[in-house]
Amino acid sequence: MLRKQIGEKGIAFIMVLWVMALLTILVTEFAYSMRTEVRAARNFKEEIEAYYLALSGVNMAIAEILLEYDFNYLGEKSGVLFAKRDGTRMPLNREFPIGDGRVSYTIIDEESKININVASRGMIWDLLRVTGIEIENRDVITDSILDWRDINQLSQLNGAEDDYYLKLAYPYEAKDGNFDTLEELLLVNGVTPEIFYGINNVPLDVFREEKKSAFSNEYSGIAEYVTTTGTGLININTASEKVLEARFGFAVANQIIAQRQAGHFQQPSYGGIVKSTSFTVLSRGYAQNGPIYHEIKAIIERNTAKPEIKIKYWNESI
């Protein structure tokens, strides 16, 4: 009888332990779940804050672009800057706190680049040359770009139209119209990720058919030197050496760089411009100065006749 009572007490004790263990697990799981929900709610709140901070940066950039200015020039850190001929310089600070967060934005001059929609054959060919593309590839890519943007199905000597693209493993048609985004160039015959981004700058998520070692030249990439917007004229204050050489030739490019080092051009010269109207804005908002941020990219075109802007491109998912 005594042994039976002891056995029953032992079973009861074990059951109590099991219940306590189960309750402990449930409480721990509940606490963890609550902490996760609180953290998720806080992150969501900070993501919303970061988005609106980034949006405020875009609006600040637009306000700058709408100011009355006479010429643009390159700043050391924050892209293109605006100035008047009387020596007035627009505010240079493009990183500042707002509330508990922080905003940082950059303005990039799209007219410091070659407009791929209006560039001549010679200009495209020379851009490929200064970025390291072999001569045989230059002819193919140049003619294929011209075929992509023209409105007919007649192929250039080294180009490609529908009869080429429709035979690919994943077929598509030539656009026969202007490029809307730079990434469309990756669809053009001959343009590889290495040629587009630069051999050392291809994003990890971009498919590469050839290994890096297969390329003999150190391609610097054409993406940073071309645009799909703007008048097609080059801003001689903000254009890179490669763009200047592709547009004006080596000798004139060196003259422009030398004069630029002595002081910014305040009047148009060499067939270029000094006052741009098309810009890319990259704005980043940080919530509470923490790791959570949001980035917005926009291409803004300013009306030359009155203080109005047109948004040509908008991306909130960078």
Residue ranges and their predicted role:
Residues L2-I318:
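Compositionally biased linear targeting/interaction segments
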